[in-house]
Regions:
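N-terminal cap/lid segment of alpha/beta-hydrolase-fold proteins
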Residues: 2-66
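The alpha/beta-hydrolase serine catalytic core
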Residues: 22-25, 35-37, 118, 164-167, ...
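Short beta-strand element of the alpha/beta-hydrolase
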Residues: 70-79
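The serine-hydrolase catalytic nucleophile loop
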Residues: 80-93
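Glycine-rich "HGGG/HGxG" loop immediately N-terminal to the catalytic nucleophile
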Residues: 86, 108-121
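Conserved alpha/beta-hydrolase
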Residues: 93-114
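Alpha/beta-hydrolase active-site loop
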Residues: 118-137
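Gly/Ala-rich beta-loop-alpha elbow adjacent to hydrolase catalytic centers
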Residues: 146-154
Length: 337
């Protein structure tokens, strides 16, 4: 289909239409739960849900109070085969809503969203539409939190969709022509209301095409083989595009050094059956240490299905403390959870 004919990096440009779009900061964030259908830059309909912060926990901690004061929203990017209606994603939303307003959505090809999954490429456009929606609702600060495939998407989104300072020239180079990575450059020139103020990548891969674990070999079978795509469609409610990437999109580890000065938190479990620990360490090594933190969580498995409430609470607290803060050094060490 034409909606998946080229990579996301070449399509990130103005003109996105979202339900209820408006200029950031024109009104206070909504206090009413909302369900809507967003429209991405390439015309895919995305099922999205808005959950206001849980008022009963408004006084639980200082971070929640600060989040409410500056209008923070956390946008949740689920893993492959997930959707906003999955119990694990709902649980993440409920925990995060103790700290901030929350937007969940279903990636293309998942749940009630349209299109077909490109397994991390065009999904960046889905996330951008959700972030724009958050800002159109009045949120002055937005954090993104992604799990597994969603983790790769939040990394790429943060690198490719940047808030540009006032007066920044849009030329690709001194001569105004196309420089290295021109498709990524065009995406970074995308509308600034789609940028994020803090990034959390949980159980994210560093590299594409990883097949080093049995779990990932099963995932590749589901993606690349007709029988696997059939099982994914009817067994996992995930519709996968049959075409290979062309061109291959920017990988998470290539995106990592482009994220600063946006704060970045990488979270990974020492019992992850999909991506071993060299993946988070590769992301840490590639990212700017002044703006990056790594949490290695003992006993944690993979993504939202395995994330305990205590970890989700800490992630939400980190996001409320970092999003909206003026760029500064946050430390670059490794923290064992």
């Amino acid at each position: 289909m034409s909606e998946d004919a080229e990579g996301a990096e070449g399509l990130f440009r103005g003109g996105t239409v979202t339900q209820g779009a408006g200029r950031t900061g024109e009104r206070a964030p909504s206090r009413t739960p909302l369900r809507t259908r967003l429209r991405t830059d390439d015309g895919v309909g995305i099922d999205a849900c808005y959950q206001p912060r849980d008022g009963s926990s408004a006084g639980r901690d200082e971070g929640a109070a600060r989040a409410a004061g500056r209008g923070l929203a956390i946008v949740v990017a689920h893993g492959f085969t997930g959707s906003l209606e999955r119990p694990a994603v709902r649980r993440v939303s409920q925990v995060f809503a103790r700290h901030a307003d929350v937007i969940t959505f279903s990636f293309r090809g998942h749940g009630r969203s349209g299109g077909r999954s490109t397994v991390g490429d065009r999904e960046v456009l889905d996330l951008a539409a959700a972030v724009r929606w958050a800002r159109s609702l009045g949120h002055s600060a937005v954090a993104t939190a992604g799990f597994s495939m969603g983790g790769s998407v939040v990394l790429r989104h943060a690198a490719l969709c940047r808030a540009e300072p006032a007066g920044t020239a849009h030329g690709a180079g001194p001569d105004g022509g196309a420089g290295p990575g021109d498709s990524a450059h065009r995406m970074r020139r995308g509308r600034t209301d789609a940028h994020t103020d803090a990034v959390v990548a949980v159980s994210a891969p560093a590299r594409w095409y990883y097949r080093g674990t049995p779990a990932m070999r099963r995932v590749h079978w589901a993606i690349q083989h007709p029988a696997g795509r059939l099982v994914s469609r009817y067994g996992l409610r995930t519709r996968i595009h049959h075409r290979d990437w062309d061109p291959v999109p920017l990988s998470p580890v290539e995106a990592a050094p482009l994220i600063a000065p946006t704060p970045l938190l990488v979270v990974h479990g020492d019992r992850d059956a999909y991506f071993p620990l060299d993946h988070p360490y590769s992301l840490l090594d590639a990212a700017d240490p002044a703006y990056t933190e790594l949490w290695i969580e003992r006993g944690f498995g993979h993504a939202e299905n395995a994330a305990p409430p205590e970890l989700l609470e800490r992630i939400a607290s980190w996001a409320t403390a970092r999003a909206g803060r003026a760029p500064r050094h946050h430390g670059g060490g490794t923290t064992d959870g």
